[in-house]
């Protein structure tokens, strides 16, 4: 009886692992169907009790695997740009830009996961699939991300994604008007405006 219980437990674990692997493979396959795109987005942030914290909007340009431009326009403007090597974060309000190596950037943020779409990143999560919805839970509990959900169609179109942090704050993003196709290379370059303080952390 004990041997049977152990065998059943092992088989159950193998089945679950296979389901997670299949979900990860399907998610990556769907995202691979679109190599570059532009979309506008709306943002809604709520606290652990469901109270509204912030509403925002902006635009997103991606050329996988390492080029992207995340431009938040409201309520406060901010820009996150990767030229493939350097990751720039620019805050016009405080007139400051920060430069870090992209290779050193954390992979446990929803946007980085979507923009890079690398197998090594997805392998860090247990992934469950329900139709076009994918729910990701980090295998390691050391980061700030508690859960990540993304809805992506079979054609690779991302409709929405959300992230829940350890304190249960939720950030939800609705993407609309996704346009698949070539993106102007200028969207993936950044030159700090004159007078802006640059914090260069690449040294």
Curated annotation (Swiss-Prot):
Subcellular location: Periplasm
Signal sequence coordinates: 1-21
Region feature (Disordered): 184-203
Classification via InterPro entries: LolA/LolB/LppX, OM_lipoprot_carrier_LolA-like, OM_lipoprot_carrier_LolA_Pbac
Keyword Protein transport: yes
UniProt KW Coiled coil keyword: no
Keywords: Chaperone, Periplasm, Protein transport, Signal, Transport
Subunit annotation: Monomer.
NCBIfam families: lolA
Protein name: Outer-membrane lipoprotein carrier protein
Species this protein is from: Klebsiella pneumoniae (strain 342)
């Amino acid at each position: 009886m004990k041997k049977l219980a152990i065998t059943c437990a092992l088989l159950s674990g193998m089945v679950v692992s296979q389901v997670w692997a299949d979900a990860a493979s399907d998610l990556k396959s769907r995202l691979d169907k679109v190599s570059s795109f532009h979309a506008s987005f709306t943002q809604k942030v709520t606290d652990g009790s469901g109270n509204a914290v912030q509403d925002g909007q902006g635009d997103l340009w991606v050329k996988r695997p390492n080029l992207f431009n995340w431009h938040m326009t409201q309520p406060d403007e901010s820009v996150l740009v990767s030229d493939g090597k350097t990751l720039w974060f620019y805050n016009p309000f405080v007139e400051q830009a920060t430069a870090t190596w992209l290779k050193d950037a954390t992979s446990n943020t929803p946007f980085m996961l979507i923009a890079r779409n690398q197998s090594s990143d997805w392998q860090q999560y247990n992934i469950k699939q329900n139709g076009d919805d994918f729910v990701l839970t980090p295998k390691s509990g050391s980061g700030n991300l508690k859960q990540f959900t993304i809805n992506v169609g079979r054609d690779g179109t991302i409709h929405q994604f959300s992230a829940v942090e350890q304190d249960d704050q939720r950030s939800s993003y609705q993407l609309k008007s996704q346009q698949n196709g070539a993106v102007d290379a200028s969207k993936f370059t950044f030159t700090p405006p004159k007078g802006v303080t640059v914090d260069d952390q690449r040294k």
